[in-house]
C-alpha cells in the first residue's frame, strides 16, 4: 500500500511540474538551470545516503525504500523528476531540525517561487517519514559543525550515526554517474564527525562515572573501593570503618597530605570531588580526635587502632619520647604483637623486626627485650591499654601542629589538642589557651585570631593574633580548632544556619558527633568482642589468660590496678567461728616511679611483714615502701626488709610487746630521726607529683559488680587484666587459758581461744638480688594517722632514690575493731577504691587480709 501511494504521488507531482514548466516558458530558464545543478548534486549524494536508508529500513520499511531508490535511479535523468527528488531530499531534513527546515523553505521559495510545491511536498512527506524516514542532508550542510553537533545532542541518535559512518565507502561504489568531487565530499564528512565523536560520547559517560579511591590504613595496608562521583566524605569514611569492623568511628577521619608534615582533613559533609585536586583520590585513615582517656573506649579494636596511630607518630617524630619511654612503649608493642616471650620461637634478635623509634639503636632493642621477657600472661588487649596509659601522659599526645609567626615575626608552632590551643617556640611550650578561656576564634586573610576571656583582675577581653603562611593555612587551622572545640567541649553539634542573602563569614560547622554523643552510642554496643589480626604476627586477638604466674626481672606487669582488685577476691575462710572482738586491717601499698635523671624502670622492693594483731588484711603492691602503725590493744606490726628474697609465702610472726613501735629493722635511729624531720618536705614533693584523680578501668568494674567471691582451684584469682597473684593463707590458734588462769585464778573466767587467719594476694615478682642488696637512699618519710570510734587508718609515705631513680611508696593500714560481723568484701573494696582515687597513677601489688577472732568456751 505504501509503494502504490508513493508512486502515484510521484506521477502526479511530475505532471504538475511539466505543466508548470510549459506555462513559465523561457523566462524561467535561469531558474531551471539552477534546479538542474541542485538535482545533480542531490543525485551525487544518493549513493552516500542509500546506506543509511537501508539501515533505517531494516526496521520494517525495506520494500518502500528499495522501490523508491529504484525509481530515483530510473528517472534521475529527467528534469522534472530531478526537481521532485530534490524537494524530497530537502524536506525530510526539516522534519529532524526545525531550523534547517526553515532555511530549506526559504531557498525553495526563492529558487522556484511557488507555494503549491511545498504544500504538496508536506502532504507526501508526512506519510513517507512515518513509514520510511530519509536522513539525507544537503552537501553544504554536512560540513557545518554547529548543525552536526546539534544532531549529536541526543543519546538516541548516536548509534544510528555510528552505523552510518561504517558504510558510506561501500555504498558510494554502487551509485553510477557520481562525480569525483561529490565522492570526496562523502569521505570528508565521516572524518570530521569522527573527530567530534569523542567529545560527544564522553558527556553521557562522565555524567554517571564512579571514582576509584585508595585509602592507606594504619596497619600499612591499602583499601581500594569505588564510590559515586558525587559521594560525600562521610560516605567513604563509613565504608572504610565497615571494612575495618570499627563502630567507634567518630575518633577517626580521612586526610589528604599536602606534604610530608602537612595534612588536610576531608570534610565529611561536602562532596569529595570539591575537596580533591586532580583525578587520583588517595587518602590516609588516621585518628582525628585523640581521646584524653583511652580507657573509656569501649572496644579493644578501637584501642588497637589508636595504638597503631601512636606508633606511627612516634616513628615519624611527631610524638617525641625519652629513651625509657621508648623502651617501655616498645615492650608493650612487642607484647601486643607476639605475646609472651618464648626463647624457642623468638630467638635473640626478634625486636629488630619492629620499627619502634625514629633512631632505633641496639641499646634500645636490648632494653625492650629485657622488659618484654618480664611480662607474663599479659593479653594483647591489656598490653594495648598499658601502652595507651603511658602514651597519653606525653606532652605532645594528640597535638595537631601548625607553623605560624607571632606579631614580631618570630617563628612559632600552634598546637591544637583536646584541652585547647598550645603555643610552642624552639620546641618548648610558651603559652596555653584552654578552651574554656577562648571566647572566639576567627581568621582574616592569612591571620588567625583568638579572643580570650578576661581574668579575675582584667576588665576587657583581649585578642591575640598570629600570622600563618597563607590564607589556606589560616582557614585550615581555624577549621581544626572549630572541630576540636565542638567535639571535646560541646554536648551536641550546632545546626548549620540557613543561608542568608549576602551572608558574611564561613558556614563551616563540625557535622559529626561530639565525644559525649560518641560515649552514649558506645555504651549501647552489645556485640561480642570482634576478632582481628595483629599486623606483625597476624595473630588473632585472643585472651592469653591461664598461664601460671612467673617471675619478673625488672618490674611487675601492672594493668593499672586491675590485678590488685581482681586478686583480692577472697576474704572469708573456712568455717567462721563465733566472733566476739573481730579486728580487721586493710593495708594498701602503692608505688610511684619518677625519672629525674636517666629514666629506667623502677626496681621492685620487697617488704617482710612481722605482724601481731587480731585480724588483719594487708595489700602490698609491686614497688611499695613502708607505712606502719601500732595495730591497737598493745599489739604491734613490725615490718622488716629482706636482704634476699627467700621468704616463705604466708609466713607471719606475731610478737606480744606493748612498747614496740613500727620501725625498719635495717635502719639506724639517726635515719629514723631524719625521716621525721623531713615530713614537710616530703608532703610538698608528694602533693606536687600527684595528678588529678580520674576514674580508672578498675573503678568502672567496681561500680558494676563485686568480684570478691570467686577463686580458682589452685588458689589463683581468675583475672582478665592483671598478672596472676599468689595466694597464701595461714591460720593460727593460740591457747591463752593458762596465762589467764595464772593471773586471775577465778572459776568464772571463761577459757579464751584466739584464732588467727591471714590471706595474702601478691603479684608475681622476680628475684632481684641487686635491688634488695641496695636499699637506696631514703629522702623523706611521712606518717599520717586518723582514728574513729571503730577504726584506725595509718598512711605512711616514703621516698627513696635507688640507682638514679626516684621511688615513692605509700602504705595504708586500716584496723577495724567491733563485736558485730564485718563485711570483709566491702571493707576491702572500699580501701582499694579510696587508695586508687587518691593516687590514680599508682598500682596495688599486694593485699593481705589478717583476721583474728577470739572464741570463748563456756
From Swiss-Prot:
Xref: Pfam families: 4_1_CTD, FA, FERM_C, FERM_M, FERM_N, SAB
Classification via PANTHER family: 4.1 G PROTEIN (PTHR23280), PROTEIN 4.1 (PTHR23280:SF12)
Function: Protein 4.1 is a major structural element of the erythrocyte membrane skeleton. It plays a key role in regulating membrane physical properties of mechanical stability and deformability by stabilizing spectrin-actin interaction. Recruits DLG1 to membranes. Required for dynein-dynactin complex and NUMA1 recruitment at the mitotic cell cortex during anaphase.
UniProt-annotated stretches for the region Disordered: 1-125, 155-208, 518-636
Protein's name according to its UniProt entry: Protein 4.1
GO MF annotation terms: actin binding; calmodulin binding; spectrin binding; structural molecule activity
In-chain residues carrying the UniProt-annotated modification Phosphotyrosine: 223, 654
UniProtKB keywords: Actin-binding, Calmodulin-binding, Cell cycle, Cell division, Cytoplasm, Cytoskeleton, Glycoprotein, Mitosis, Nucleus, Phosphoprotein, Transport
InterPro entries: Band_4.1_C, Band_41_domain, EPB4.1_FERM_F1, Ez/rad/moesin-like, FA, FERM/acyl-CoA-bd_prot_sf, FERM_2, FERM_central
Organism, as annotated: Mus musculus (Mouse)
Assigned GO CC terms: actin cytoskeleton; basolateral plasma membrane; cell cortex; cortical cytoskeleton; membrane; nucleus
Biased composition range(s): Low complexity: 31-50, 78-89
Amino acid at each position: 500500500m505504501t509503494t502504490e501511494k508513493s508512486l502515484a504521488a510521484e506521477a502526479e507531482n511530475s505532471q504538475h511540474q511539466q505543466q508548470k514548466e510549459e506555462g513559465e516558458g523561457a523566462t524561467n530558464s535561469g531558474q531551471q538551470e539552477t534546479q538542474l545543478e541542485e538535482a545533480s548534486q542531490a543525485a551525487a549524494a544518493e549513493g552516500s545516503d542509500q546506506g543509511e536508508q537501508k539501515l533505517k529500513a531494516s526496521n520494517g520499511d525495506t520494500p518502500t525504500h528499495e522501490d523508491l531508490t529504484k525509481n530515483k535511479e530510473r528517472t534521475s535523468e529527467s528534469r522534472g523528476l530531478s526537481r521532485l527528488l530534490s524537494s524530497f531530499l530537502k524536506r525530510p531534513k526539516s522534519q529532524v531540525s526545525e531550523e534547517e527546515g526553515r532555511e530549506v523553505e526559504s531557498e525553495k521559495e526563492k529558487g522556484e517561487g511557488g507555494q503549491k510545491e511545498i504544500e504538496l511536498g508536506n502532504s507526501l512527506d508526512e506519510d513517507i517519514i512515518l513509514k520510511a524516514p530519509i536522513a539525507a542532508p544537503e552537501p553544504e550542510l554536512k560540513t557545518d559543525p554547529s548543525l552536526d553537533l546539534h544532531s549529536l545532542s541526543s543519546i538516541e541518535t548516536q548509534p544510528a550515526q555510528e552505523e552510518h559512518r561504517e558504510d558510506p565507502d561501500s555504498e558510494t561504489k554502487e551509485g553510477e554517474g557520481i562525480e569525483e568531487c561529490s565522492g570526496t565530499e562523502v569521505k570528508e564528512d565521516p572524518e570530521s564527525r569522527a573527530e567530534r565523536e569523542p567529545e560527544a560520547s564522553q558527556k553521557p559517560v562522565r555524567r554517571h562515572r564512579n571514582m576509584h579511591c585508595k585509602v592507606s590504613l594504619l596497619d600499612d595496608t591499602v583499601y581500594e573501593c569505588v564510590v559515586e562521583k558525587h559521594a560525600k566524605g562521610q560516605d567513604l569514611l563509613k565504608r572504610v570503618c565497615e571494612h575495618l569492623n570499627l563502630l567507634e568511628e567518630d575518633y577517626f577521619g580521612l586526610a589528604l597530605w599536602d606534604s610530608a608534615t602537612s595534612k588536610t582533613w576531608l570534610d565529611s559533609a561536602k562532596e569529595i570531588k570539591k575537596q580533591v585536586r586532580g583525578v587520583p583520590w588517595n587518602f590516609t585513615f588516621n585518628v582525628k580526635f585523640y581521646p584524653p582517656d583511652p580507657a573509656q573506649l569501649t572496644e579493644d579494636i578501637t584501642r588497637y587502632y589508636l595504638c597503631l596511630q601512636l606508633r606511627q607518630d612516634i616513628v615519624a617524630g611527631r610524638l617525641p619520647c625519652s629513651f625509657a619511654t621508648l623502651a617501655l612503649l616498645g615492650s608493650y608493642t612487642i607484647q601486643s604483637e607476639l605475646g609472651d616471650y618464648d626463647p624457642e620461637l623468638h630467638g635473640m634478635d626478634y625486636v629488630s623486626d619492629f620499627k619502634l623509634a625514629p633512631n632505633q639503636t641496639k641499646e634500645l632493642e636490648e632494653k625492650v627485650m629485657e622488659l618484654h621477657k618480664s611480662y607474663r600472661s599479659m593479653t594483647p588487649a591489656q598490653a594495648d591499654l598499658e601502652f595507651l596509659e603511658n602514651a597519653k601522659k606525653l606532652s605532645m599526645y594528640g597535638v595537631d601542629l601548625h607553623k605560624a609567626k607571632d606579631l614580631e615575626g618570630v617563628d612559632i608552632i600552634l598546637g591544637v589538642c583536646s584541652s585547647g590551643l598550645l603555643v610552642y617556640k624552639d620546641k618548648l611550650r610558651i603559652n596555653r589557651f584552654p578552651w574554656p578561656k577562648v571566647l572566639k576564634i576567627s581568621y582574616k586573610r592569612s591571620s588567625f585570631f583568638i579572643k580570650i576571656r578576661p581574668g579575675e583582675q582584667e576588665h576587657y577581653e583581649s585578642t591575640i593574633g598570629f600570622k600563618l603562611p597563607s590564607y589556606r593555612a589560616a582557614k585550615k587551622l581555624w577549621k581544626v580548632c572549630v572541630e576540636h572545640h565542638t567535639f571535646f567541649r560541646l554536648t551536641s553539634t550546632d545546626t548549620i544556619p540557613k543561608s542568608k542573602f549576602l551572608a558574611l563569614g564561613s558556614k563551616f560547622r563540625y557535622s559529626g558527633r561530639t565525644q559525649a554523643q560518641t560515649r552514649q552510642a558506645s555504651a549501647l554496643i552489645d556485640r561480642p568482642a570482634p576478632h582481628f589480626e595483629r599486623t606483625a604476627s597476624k595473630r588473632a586477638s585472643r585472651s592469653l589468660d591461664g598461664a601460671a604466674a612467673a617471675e619478673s626481672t625488672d618490674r611487675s606487669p601492672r594493668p593499672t590496678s586491675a590485678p590488685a582488685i581482681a586478686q583480692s577476691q577472697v576474704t572469708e575462710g573456712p568455717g567462721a567461728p563465733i566472733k566476739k572482738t573481730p579486728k580487721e586491717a586493710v593495708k594498701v601499698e602503692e608505688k610511684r616511679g619518677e625519672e629525674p635523671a636517666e629514666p629506667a624502670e623502677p626496681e621492685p622492693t620487697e617488704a617482710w611483714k612481722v605482724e601481731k594483731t587480731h585480724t588483719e588484711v594487708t595489700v602490698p603492691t609491686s614497688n611499695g615502701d613502708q607505712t606502719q602503725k601500732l595495730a591497737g590493744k598493745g599489739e604491734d606490726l613490725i615490718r622488716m626488709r629482706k636482704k634476699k628474697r627467700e621468704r616463705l609465702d604466708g609466713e607471719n610472726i606475731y610478737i606480744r610487746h606493748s612498747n614496740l613501735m613500727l620501725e625498719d629493722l635495717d635502719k639506724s635511729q639517726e635515719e629514723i630521726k631524719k625521716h621525721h624531720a623531713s615530713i614537710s618536705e616530703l608532703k610538698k614533693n608528694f602533693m606536687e607529683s600527684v595528678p588529678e584523680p580520674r576514674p580508672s578501668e578498675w573503678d568502672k568494674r567496681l561500680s558494676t559488680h563485686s568480684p570478691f567471691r570467686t577463686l580458682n582451684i589452685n588458689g589463683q584469682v581468675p583475672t582478665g587484666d592483671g598478672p596472676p597473684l599468689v595466694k597464701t593463707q595461714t591460720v593460727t590458734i593460740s591457747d591463752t587459758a593458762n596465762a589467764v588462769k595464772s593471773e586471775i585464778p577465778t572459776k568464772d573466767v571463761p577459757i579464751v581461744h584466739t584464732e588467727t587467719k591471714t590471706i595474702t594476694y601478691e603479684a608475681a615478682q622476680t628475684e632481684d638480688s641487686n635491688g634488695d642488696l641496695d636499699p637506696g637512699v631514703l629522702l623523706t618519710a611521712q606518717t599520717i594517722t586518723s582514728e574513729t570510734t571503730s577504726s584506725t587508718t595509718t598512711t605512711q609515705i616514703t621516698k627513696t632514690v635507688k640507682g638514679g631513680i626516684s621511688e615513692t611508696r605509700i602504705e595504708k593500714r586500716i584496723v577495724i575493731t567491733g563485736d558485730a560481723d564485718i563485711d570483709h568484701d566491702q571493707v576491702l573494696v572500699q580501701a582499694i577504691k579510696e587508695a586508687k582515687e587518691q593516687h590514680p597513677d599508682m598500682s596495688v601489688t599486694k593485699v593481705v587480709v589478717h583476721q583474728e577472732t577470739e572464741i570463748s568456751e563456756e
